[in-house]
Protein backbone atom coordinates (compact mmCIF):
# COMPACT_ATOMS: atom_id res chain seq x y z
CA UNK A 1 0.00 0.00 0.00
CA UNK A 2 1.35 3.38 -1.00
CA UNK A 3 1.23 5.75 2.00
CA UNK A 4 3.25 8.68 3.11
CA UNK A 5 3.05 11.30 5.83
CA UNK A 6 2.61 15.03 5.67
CA UNK A 7 3.07 16.44 9.14
CA UNK A 8 0.74 14.48 11.41
CA UNK A 9 -1.67 13.50 8.60
CA UNK A 10 -1.17 10.19 6.80
CA UNK A 11 -2.16 10.38 3.16
CA UNK A 12 -2.52 7.42 0.85
CA UNK A 13 -4.84 5.05 -0.90
CA UNK A 14 -8.22 4.94 0.90
CA UNK A 15 -6.99 7.20 3.65
CA UNK A 16 -7.47 10.88 3.04
CA UNK A 17 -6.57 13.92 5.07
CA UNK A 18 -10.25 14.87 5.27
CA UNK A 19 -11.17 11.54 6.85
CA UNK A 20 -8.25 11.83 9.27
CA UNK A 21 -9.22 15.35 10.36
CA UNK A 22 -12.88 14.32 10.67
CA UNK A 23 -11.95 11.41 12.94
CA UNK A 24 -9.76 13.69 15.04
CA UNK A 25 -12.60 16.19 15.52
CA UNK A 26 -15.09 13.45 16.48
CA UNK A 27 -12.67 12.07 19.07
CA UNK A 28 -12.09 15.53 20.55
CA UNK A 29 -15.86 16.11 20.87
CA UNK A 30 -16.21 12.87 22.82
CA UNK A 31 -13.47 13.80 25.26
CA UNK A 32 -14.83 15.41 28.38
CA UNK A 33 -13.16 18.31 30.05
CA UNK A 34 -12.72 18.16 33.81
CA UNK A 35 -13.18 21.42 35.68
CA UNK A 36 -12.39 22.03 39.34
CA UNK A 37 -14.30 24.80 41.13
CA UNK A 38 -13.46 25.85 44.68
CA UNK A 39 -16.08 27.70 46.77
CA UNK A 40 -16.27 29.26 50.20
CA UNK A 41 -18.46 31.63 52.15
CA UNK A 42 -17.50 33.68 55.16
CA UNK A 43 -19.25 35.98 57.57
CA UNK A 44 -16.31 38.41 57.73
CA UNK A 45 -17.46 40.92 55.17
CA UNK A 46 -20.37 38.61 54.28
CA UNK A 47 -18.55 37.38 51.17
CA UNK A 48 -18.55 34.35 48.92
CA UNK A 49 -15.70 33.27 46.67
CA UNK A 50 -15.44 31.03 43.61
CA UNK A 51 -12.17 29.90 42.04
CA UNK A 52 -12.29 28.26 38.58
CA UNK A 53 -8.91 26.57 38.06
CA UNK A 54 -9.57 25.77 34.39
CA UNK A 55 -9.95 29.45 33.51
CA UNK A 56 -7.67 30.89 36.22
CA UNK A 57 -10.62 32.95 37.38
CA UNK A 58 -11.49 34.18 40.87
CA UNK A 59 -14.82 35.79 41.70
CA UNK A 60 -15.64 37.40 45.05
CA UNK A 61 -19.17 38.61 45.80
CA UNK A 62 -20.36 40.57 48.80
CA UNK A 63 -23.77 39.59 50.11
CA UNK A 64 -25.95 41.87 52.22
CA UNK A 65 -28.17 40.91 55.11
CA UNK A 66 -27.79 38.96 58.31
CA UNK A 67 -26.53 35.62 57.01
CA UNK A 68 -24.95 32.73 58.86
CA UNK A 69 -21.74 31.09 57.72
CA UNK A 70 -23.69 28.03 56.50
CA UNK A 71 -26.04 30.23 54.47
CA UNK A 72 -23.04 31.90 52.85
CA UNK A 73 -21.52 28.49 52.11
CA UNK A 74 -24.77 27.46 50.38
CA UNK A 75 -24.87 30.75 48.46
CA UNK A 76 -21.31 30.10 47.26
CA UNK A 77 -22.38 26.67 45.96
CA UNK A 78 -25.48 28.20 44.32
CA UNK A 79 -23.34 30.84 42.63
CA UNK A 80 -20.96 28.11 41.44
CA UNK A 81 -23.86 26.07 40.02
CA UNK A 82 -25.17 29.10 38.09
CA UNK A 83 -21.63 29.85 36.89
CA UNK A 84 -21.17 26.23 35.77
CA UNK A 85 -24.50 26.04 33.96
CA UNK A 86 -23.62 29.22 32.02
CA UNK A 87 -20.00 28.33 31.17
CA UNK A 88 -19.17 24.66 31.51
CA UNK A 89 -22.24 22.78 30.29
CA UNK A 90 -20.29 19.94 28.63
CA UNK A 91 -17.64 19.55 31.30
CA UNK A 92 -17.42 17.13 34.20
CA UNK A 93 -17.33 19.42 37.21
CA UNK A 94 -16.10 18.92 40.74
CA UNK A 95 -17.03 21.58 43.28
CA UNK A 96 -14.76 21.61 46.32
CA UNK A 97 -15.95 23.06 49.63
CA UNK A 98 -14.51 23.00 53.14
CA UNK A 99 -18.01 22.82 54.66
CA UNK A 100 -18.76 19.24 55.69
CA UNK A 101 -22.34 20.27 56.44
CA UNK A 102 -23.03 21.57 52.93
CA UNK A 103 -21.22 18.74 51.13
CA UNK A 104 -22.89 16.00 53.17
CA UNK A 105 -26.36 17.56 52.88
CA UNK A 106 -26.09 17.97 49.10
CA UNK A 107 -24.76 14.41 48.77
CA UNK A 108 -27.73 13.15 50.79
CA UNK A 109 -25.67 11.87 53.70
CA UNK A 110 -26.96 14.33 56.32
CA UNK A 111 -30.44 15.72 56.95
CA UNK A 112 -31.27 19.41 56.90
CA UNK A 113 -32.39 20.41 60.38
CA UNK A 114 -32.33 24.20 59.99
CA UNK A 115 -35.35 25.84 58.36
CA UNK A 116 -33.22 28.66 56.93
CA UNK A 117 -31.07 26.20 54.95
CA UNK A 118 -33.91 24.19 53.37
CA UNK A 119 -34.72 26.72 50.58
CA UNK A 120 -31.02 27.05 49.72
CA UNK A 121 -30.65 23.27 49.60
CA UNK A 122 -33.71 22.99 47.34
CA UNK A 123 -32.28 25.57 44.92
CA UNK A 124 -28.95 23.71 44.81
CA UNK A 125 -30.64 20.39 44.07
CA UNK A 126 -32.62 21.93 41.17
CA UNK A 127 -29.36 23.11 39.59
CA UNK A 128 -27.30 19.94 40.16
CA UNK A 129 -26.73 17.64 37.18
CA UNK A 130 -25.15 14.23 36.80
CA UNK A 131 -21.94 15.90 35.55
CA UNK A 132 -21.51 17.90 38.76
CA UNK A 133 -19.97 16.39 41.89
CA UNK A 134 -19.38 18.11 45.20
CA UNK A 135 -16.54 17.03 47.47
CA UNK A 136 -15.16 18.07 50.82
CA UNK A 137 -11.58 19.29 51.15
CA UNK A 138 -9.71 20.61 54.15
CA UNK A 139 -9.65 24.33 54.83
CA UNK A 140 -5.93 24.52 54.00
CA UNK A 141 -6.55 23.09 50.51
CA UNK A 142 -9.55 25.26 49.62
CA UNK A 143 -8.27 27.97 47.27
CA UNK A 144 -11.44 30.04 47.71
CA UNK A 145 -11.14 29.91 51.49
CA UNK A 146 -7.51 30.97 51.37
CA UNK A 147 -8.47 33.98 49.25
CA UNK A 148 -11.31 34.98 51.60
CA UNK A 149 -8.96 34.85 54.60
CA UNK A 150 -6.65 37.47 53.09
What are these regions (language model features)?
Residues 73, 77:
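Short, conserved alpha-helix that lines the donor NDP-sugar binding/gating region
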Residues 2-8:
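Intrinsic-disorder-associated, low-complexity terminal segments enriched in Asp/Asn/His/Tyr and depleted
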Residues 15, 19-71, 82-83:
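RNase H-like nuclease fold core
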Residues 5, 64-65, 112:
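Generic detector of short alpha-helix boundary/capping microenvironments
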Residues 42-44, 78-150:
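RNase H catalytic domain
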